[in-house]
Amino acid sequence: MTRHCDVSIPDSPEPPFPITTSFVDVIAGFGRGSAELGIPTANVPIDDLPKIVEQLDTGVYFGWCKVRMAKDRDTKVEQRPDGREVQYNNGTLLNDEDLAVLPVVLSVGWNPFYQNKNKTVELHIIHKFSDNFYGAQIKFNFLGYIRPELDYTTKDALIADIHTDIEIAKEKLQLPGYRKLKDTL
Protein backbone atom coordinates (compact mmCIF):
# COMPACT_ATOMS: atom_id res chain seq x y z
CA MET A 1 0.00 0.00 0.00
CA THR A 2 3.01 2.33 0.30
CA ARG A 3 3.55 4.72 -2.60
CA HIS A 4 6.63 6.77 -3.44
CA CYS A 5 4.82 9.91 -2.28
CA ASP A 6 3.70 8.63 1.14
CA VAL A 7 5.34 10.07 4.22
CA SER A 8 6.16 8.05 7.31
CA ILE A 9 3.26 8.33 9.75
CA PRO A 10 4.07 7.94 13.47
CA ASP A 11 1.97 5.79 15.83
CA SER A 12 0.42 8.89 17.42
CA PRO A 13 0.10 12.56 16.45
CA GLU A 14 3.20 14.72 16.55
CA PRO A 15 3.27 18.54 16.42
CA PRO A 16 1.61 20.44 14.90
CA PHE A 17 -1.07 17.76 15.33
CA PRO A 18 -3.71 17.47 16.56
CA ILE A 19 -5.35 20.52 15.06
CA THR A 20 -9.05 20.75 15.93
CA THR A 21 -11.58 23.09 14.37
CA SER A 22 -14.74 24.58 15.79
CA PHE A 23 -18.02 23.69 14.10
CA VAL A 24 -18.07 25.30 10.64
CA ASP A 25 -20.66 25.31 7.87
CA VAL A 26 -20.65 22.72 5.10
CA ILE A 27 -20.84 24.61 1.80
CA ALA A 28 -21.32 23.54 -1.80
CA GLY A 29 -18.15 23.02 -3.77
CA PHE A 30 -17.86 22.28 -7.46
CA GLY A 31 -19.76 18.99 -7.18
CA ARG A 32 -16.91 17.01 -8.72
CA GLY A 33 -16.23 14.68 -5.80
CA SER A 34 -19.50 12.81 -6.13
CA ALA A 35 -20.36 13.40 -9.76
CA GLU A 36 -16.98 12.82 -11.41
CA LEU A 37 -15.00 10.78 -8.93
CA GLY A 38 -17.62 8.83 -6.98
CA ILE A 39 -15.96 10.17 -3.83
CA PRO A 40 -18.21 12.78 -2.21
CA THR A 41 -16.61 15.59 -0.23
CA ALA A 42 -17.80 18.12 2.30
CA ASN A 43 -16.38 21.55 1.59
CA VAL A 44 -15.74 24.10 4.31
CA PRO A 45 -14.70 27.76 4.14
CA ILE A 46 -10.94 27.83 4.75
CA ASP A 47 -11.29 31.30 6.31
CA ASP A 48 -13.41 29.80 9.13
CA LEU A 49 -10.69 27.33 10.16
CA PRO A 50 -7.81 27.86 12.61
CA LYS A 51 -5.14 30.04 10.97
CA ILE A 52 -2.59 27.21 11.23
CA VAL A 53 -4.57 25.28 8.59
CA GLU A 54 -3.59 27.85 5.95
CA GLN A 55 0.05 27.23 6.87
CA LEU A 56 -0.16 23.44 6.47
CA ASP A 57 1.60 21.85 3.52
CA THR A 58 -0.77 21.07 0.70
CA GLY A 59 -1.71 17.43 0.57
CA VAL A 60 -3.80 14.73 2.18
CA TYR A 61 -4.44 14.43 5.93
CA PHE A 62 -6.54 12.16 8.13
CA GLY A 63 -8.56 12.56 11.31
CA TRP A 64 -12.02 12.37 12.85
CA CYS A 65 -15.11 14.49 12.23
CA LYS A 66 -18.57 15.10 13.62
CA VAL A 67 -21.50 16.51 11.65
CA ARG A 68 -24.45 18.23 13.34
CA MET A 69 -27.66 19.78 12.14
CA ALA A 70 -27.70 23.57 11.88
CA LYS A 71 -30.74 24.63 13.82
CA ASP A 72 -32.95 27.62 13.18
CA ARG A 73 -32.03 27.98 9.51
CA ASP A 74 -34.33 27.93 6.54
CA THR A 75 -33.63 25.49 3.76
CA LYS A 76 -32.57 27.09 0.50
CA VAL A 77 -31.51 26.30 -3.03
CA GLU A 78 -28.35 27.78 -4.54
CA GLN A 79 -27.01 27.51 -8.03
CA ARG A 80 -23.46 26.34 -8.77
CA PRO A 81 -21.41 28.20 -11.40
CA ASP A 82 -22.21 25.37 -13.83
CA GLY A 83 -25.94 25.95 -13.38
CA ARG A 84 -26.71 22.88 -11.24
CA GLU A 85 -28.86 23.49 -8.18
CA VAL A 86 -27.81 22.60 -4.64
CA GLN A 87 -30.39 22.02 -1.91
CA TYR A 88 -29.26 23.25 1.50
CA ASN A 89 -31.18 21.10 4.00
CA ASN A 90 -28.92 22.08 6.94
CA GLY A 91 -28.50 18.45 7.96
CA THR A 92 -32.16 17.89 8.75
CA LEU A 93 -32.05 14.55 6.90
CA LEU A 94 -29.13 13.14 8.91
CA ASN A 95 -29.74 10.01 10.99
CA ASP A 96 -28.08 8.87 14.24
CA GLU A 97 -25.31 6.99 12.41
CA ASP A 98 -24.53 10.11 10.36
CA LEU A 99 -24.19 12.13 13.58
CA ALA A 100 -21.55 9.85 15.12
CA VAL A 101 -17.85 10.71 15.17
CA LEU A 102 -16.55 9.37 11.84
CA PRO A 103 -13.17 8.90 10.15
CA VAL A 104 -12.19 11.46 7.54
CA VAL A 105 -9.58 12.04 4.84
CA LEU A 106 -8.89 15.73 4.19
CA SER A 107 -7.47 17.41 1.13
CA VAL A 108 -5.79 20.78 1.63
CA GLY A 109 -4.65 22.52 -1.50
CA TRP A 110 -5.24 23.74 -5.01
CA ASN A 111 -6.42 20.52 -6.70
CA PRO A 112 -4.03 20.92 -9.64
CA PHE A 113 -5.88 18.27 -11.67
CA TYR A 114 -8.82 20.70 -11.76
CA GLN A 115 -6.66 23.85 -11.83
CA ASN A 116 -8.40 25.51 -8.88
CA LYS A 117 -7.57 29.16 -8.34
CA ASN A 118 -8.26 29.14 -4.59
CA LYS A 119 -6.87 26.93 -1.85
CA THR A 120 -9.56 24.64 -0.46
CA VAL A 121 -10.18 22.18 2.34
CA GLU A 122 -12.33 19.22 1.31
CA LEU A 123 -13.32 16.35 3.58
CA HIS A 124 -14.16 12.86 2.42
CA ILE A 125 -16.01 11.34 5.35
CA ILE A 126 -15.53 7.58 5.40
CA HIS A 127 -19.22 6.81 5.76
CA LYS A 128 -22.18 6.36 3.42
CA PHE A 129 -24.70 9.18 3.87
CA SER A 130 -28.20 8.71 2.48
CA ASP A 131 -28.55 12.38 1.55
CA ASN A 132 -26.53 15.57 1.25
CA PHE A 133 -26.04 17.80 4.27
CA TYR A 134 -25.21 21.20 2.78
CA GLY A 135 -25.72 23.86 5.43
CA ALA A 136 -25.07 21.46 8.31
CA GLN A 137 -22.07 22.07 10.53
CA ILE A 138 -18.93 19.97 10.92
CA LYS A 139 -16.14 19.86 13.46
CA PHE A 140 -12.99 17.91 12.66
CA ASN A 141 -9.38 17.35 13.50
CA PHE A 142 -6.18 16.94 11.55
CA LEU A 143 -4.19 14.12 13.14
CA GLY A 144 -1.58 13.29 10.54
CA TYR A 145 -0.23 13.85 7.05
CA ILE A 146 -0.42 11.09 4.42
CA ARG A 147 1.15 12.63 1.33
CA PRO A 148 1.73 15.83 -0.63
CA GLU A 149 -0.74 17.15 -3.19
CA LEU A 150 -0.04 15.74 -6.64
CA ASP A 151 -1.03 16.65 -10.16
CA TYR A 152 -2.56 13.76 -12.09
CA THR A 153 -2.58 12.99 -15.77
CA THR A 154 -5.75 10.88 -15.52
CA LYS A 155 -8.88 10.86 -13.41
CA ASP A 156 -8.41 7.11 -12.81
CA ALA A 157 -4.99 7.71 -11.23
CA LEU A 158 -6.51 10.37 -8.96
CA ILE A 159 -9.34 8.04 -7.91
CA ALA A 160 -6.90 5.17 -7.22
CA ASP A 161 -4.75 7.39 -5.00
CA ILE A 162 -7.77 8.66 -3.07
CA HIS A 163 -8.82 5.07 -2.39
CA THR A 164 -5.31 4.31 -1.12
CA ASP A 165 -5.45 7.44 1.08
CA ILE A 166 -8.71 6.15 2.57
CA GLU A 167 -7.18 2.76 3.38
CA ILE A 168 -4.13 4.37 4.99
CA ALA A 169 -6.37 6.65 7.08
CA LYS A 170 -8.56 3.76 8.25
CA GLU A 171 -5.47 1.76 9.24
CA LYS A 172 -3.80 4.62 11.15
CA LEU A 173 -7.00 5.67 12.93
CA GLN A 174 -7.15 2.21 14.53
CA LEU A 175 -3.87 2.84 16.35
CA PRO A 176 -4.47 3.76 20.03
CA GLY A 177 -2.69 7.12 19.69
CA TYR A 178 -5.18 8.24 17.03
CA ARG A 179 -8.25 6.29 18.12
CA LYS A 180 -8.32 8.02 21.53
CA LEU A 181 -8.72 11.41 19.83
CA LYS A 182 -12.08 10.30 18.45
CA ASP A 183 -13.56 11.19 21.84
CA THR A 184 -12.32 14.80 21.72
CA LEU A 185 -14.92 15.97 19.20
Swiss-Prot record:
The record's free-text note on cofactor binding: Zinc or magnesium.
Reported cofactor(s): Zn(2+); Mg(2+)
GO MF term set: ATP binding; metal ion binding; riboflavin kinase activity
SUPFAM superfamilies listed in its UniProt record: Riboflavin kinase-like
Gene Ontology cellular component list: mitochondrion
Binding site for Mg(2+): T41, N43
Name assigned to this protein: Riboflavin kinase
